[in-house]
Amino acid sequence: MKKKRIVSTLLALLLLASLPVSALAAEWDIGKGDITVNAESGGQTVRQGGGAAVPDSAPVITGTSKENNVTINAESGQTASVTLSGVNIDVRDKGKAAVSTTGEGNVSIELNGGSTLRSGYEHAGLEKNNGGSLTIADEDKNGKLTAWGGQQGAGIGGGSGKDGSNIFITGGGVNAIGGLAAAGIGGGLGGNGSNITISGGKVGATNGLNGAGIGGGQHGSGSNITISGGEVNAIGGDSSAGIGGGHTGDGSDITISGGEVSASGGKSGAGIGGGVYGKGEGITVSGNAQLKVRGGRVQGDYGTGAGIGGGGSYGTDGAEVEPDICALNPGGKIEYYAPRSSMSGTPNKTVTNPTGDFVWDSGRVTKPATCTEKGVRTYTCTGSTHTRTEDIPALNHSFAGQAYVSDNNATCEQDGTKTIRCVRYGRGGCTEKDTVVD
């Protein structure tokens, strides 16, 4: 009986050991060595130091280190998932990134408690090198992350010479501080910031010199930036926009559709738009967005930045650009503040759409579609100069209702032919016809 119990116990242990452990959610202390998370088609593993790879689909990284860092790799088509739980990594003296992402897949980082990342020279605090997306989330509403870039590295995004793109923040208290010449969130020195979306959380993005709060690093532009929710405070460094271009960079295709957003340009930088010498265009404010903007003050002989629009240039202030407010709800507004003024005081100007005066018309065809080419319909916002376009699908060839017409009659020695033409034959360059033997 005793032997049977021993055998049964051993069998149970063997069975337990054979069960898949990919759902394991273990804690990994960064103080015990470098951590590498690897998501492949066969599952996700974690390796620490020189140890073996351990299956773990939801690792929780904790602890403190001034030596070790975290690498999160995701293969194409895979998503690597990691939780940062009260982790503090300061590798400024080691010349490397505190946390970096690699591979062609996606990376998802959950925040739990307060974590701080500080990276070394030319590296971003949270350095995004993966080809897919980087998502920062906070499902439990208790997470915070502070990410400091080293010189030339973004707080969150690209290292020196690298772009910061496909970044999504859905929640958490996120504070991103760019290093010299890099964005808070976006590109490093010389890098662009694009496809950046903030839909929730409390987000601060700042830089001290030549990088945008959100967007491009020095000489980099910011584009396709969307804020749809949360609280966002973006402060550009000298010569840079709060949201948009870094020093000499442009800001374009920027949409504020919700949330409470404050965007302040550094010296000669726009609140939203271009850095010094940079343009601002394609800026939309819609929904119930609560937006405050302030252009940067003069610096030497360089003019002020626009609230929304261009950065200043030598002897000239940045040009203000009228944002598209055609979809701004009565509850939404834009408040403009003068350079140097407090953004908690009275604005210089407030823009609203209280009665829906700014609306899109029904549109007009500006390029007719043909059988083979798409057309274009253009809409104009009433009361403004803004337009938008949409494609009209190609019509494709049609022989409906058409009859074959004899080209030549058959003879005793030769077949005749007859032809049917597309209903739009001769219009829009259409020459489509079908000829058959009669």
What are these regions (language model features)?
Residues R5-T9, L16, A23-V359:
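A composition-driven surface/loop motif
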Residues M1-K3:
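N-terminal secretory signal peptides that target proteins for export/translocation
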Residues P354-D438:
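Extracellular modular ligand-binding repeats in secreted and cell-surface proteins
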